[in-house]
Design a protein with these regions (language model features):
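Conserved hydrophobic helix-helix packing surfaces used for dimerization/oligomerization
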Residues: 24-27, 48
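N-terminal Rossmann-fold NAD(P) dinucleotide-binding loop
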Residues: 34-35
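Conserved Rossmann-fold dehydrogenase catalytic segment
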Residues: 169-176, 195-209
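Gly/Ala-rich phosphate-binding loop of Rossmann-like dinucleotide-binding domains
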Residues: 38, 42-43
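Phosphate-coordination loops involved in phosphoryl transfer and adenosine-cofactor binding
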Residues: 19-24, 85, 103, 131
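Conserved N-terminal Rossmann-fold NAD(P) cofactor-binding segment
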Residues: 2-14, 47-104, 114-115, 119
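Rossmann-fold NAD(P)-binding glycine/threonine-rich loop
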Residues: 113-193
Length: 209
């Protein structure tokens, strides 16, 4: 059965800014997309916490630092300037997950497995601020299924934000709300993407798995 789509006809996606901009963010997952999303948020002036899993042994930040280094060395460049890169703070899920309680926007960009994403969002709900926007960067999984088991309040602040690779250069941000996503959350993300990230905005319907 297809999930009922949010009626987007009343949304003000291209109006002048009517929502506060994001100042801080956390990106969970430091693969190619996660690290470069973090880079472009830093380009827009945000303080960004980039987190990934800790390996079984050795430096607990080895995985996240590898992803961050790849973003800093990317060609074409992911960061506008070296100063922008200094706004990204790396960490790991074991030691630093509570940092997401400090941010305005939490973006999950872990591997495309439903079970892993659900586990991550359960942890996000435990630590995120009650007013934080929470999104997933999935390109293929149903957004509403990722949020299964979460509270109604969480679901109102949750949506899909599909960046295209490389995020700095591809000028499109696909926003995928669920039936439960609050319209003002969609508007806020769309306005920020358009005004601060330089994105054209497409609002897409969530689909069944």
């Amino acid at each position: 059965m297809e999930t009922k789509a949010l009626d987007t006809r009343s949304l003000h996606l291209s109006a002048p800014a009517t929502h506060p901009p994001f100042r801080t963010a956390a990106v969970l997952g430091a693969g190619t997309m996660g690290a470069q999303i973090a880079a472009h948020l830093a380009n827009a002036g945000l303080e960004v916490h980039l987190l990934d899993i800790a390996p079984d042994d050795g430096d607990p930040n080895r995985i996240v630092n590898k992803g961050f280094k790849a973003a800093k060395n990317a060609s074409p460049a992911a960061f506008f300037t070296d100063d922008a890169a200094e706004r990204v703070y790396t960490g790991n899920f074991d030691d630093d997950f509570e940092r997401i309680g400090e941010v305005d926007w939490v973006i999950e960009a872990v591997v495309e497995r439903m079970d892993i994403k659900r586990d991550v969002h359960a942890r996000i709900e435990e630590h995120a601020r009650e007013d934080a926007v929470i999104s997933t960067n999935t390109s293929g999984l149903p957004i509403h299924e990722i949020a299964e088991g979460r509270s109604e309040d969480f679901k109102q602040r949750f949506l899909g934000t599909h960046f295209f690779n490389p995020p700095r250069y591809l000028k499109l941000l696909e926003i995928i709300p669920t039936q439960a996503t609050a319209p003002d959350v969609v508007e806020r993300v769309a306005q920020f993407g358009r005004l601060h990230l330089g994105k054209g905005i497409v609002v897409a319907n969530d689909v069944p798995y």
